[in-house]
Amino acid sequence: MAKCEKGYLCAVCGKEVEDLIDSELYLRYTVGWLDPEKLHIAPERHLMCNPALAQFINDERFSELKVPSEADKQQLDAEFVAKRTELLTRGYRRLVELQQAGESVSITDYPLPEAAARYRLGG
């Protein structure tokens, strides 16, 4: 993360979210679930501290999570799970790319193309 992006504390465990690839906040922003205008006031969490969301990341660099009972993706509609997994996995892979690029990427370039297009249109 850029220096200005460091210091976010996890709303669940209270520890600093040190790396972009651990950030639920930036994953939500990258996939288009968080308005850029709310990025600085939205709560942050480690991805691992939100297993209900993190279970949809399907990447060898991310630890697989088991989620208790009704929140487990195995209990959800297969089409919903497939779409959510595709989106959040792409978002996570984008965070990996961004972290590898270092501070050379503008925050306005973080979102996936379809999210960036929605943000530009104001919706």
PLM region descriptions:
Residues 30-45, 67-77:
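Short microdomains enriched in Cys/His and/or Lys/Arg
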Residues 62-123:
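Long, contiguous alpha-helical scaffold regions
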Residues 5-38, 59:
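Short recognition patches in nucleic-acid-associated and regulatory proteins
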Residues 36-64:
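Short metal-binding segments enriched for Cys and/or His
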Residues 21-24, 28, 41, 51, ...:
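Alpha-helical structural elements
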Residues 1-3:
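Short, charged surface segments at domain edges that flank catalytic/cofactor-binding sites
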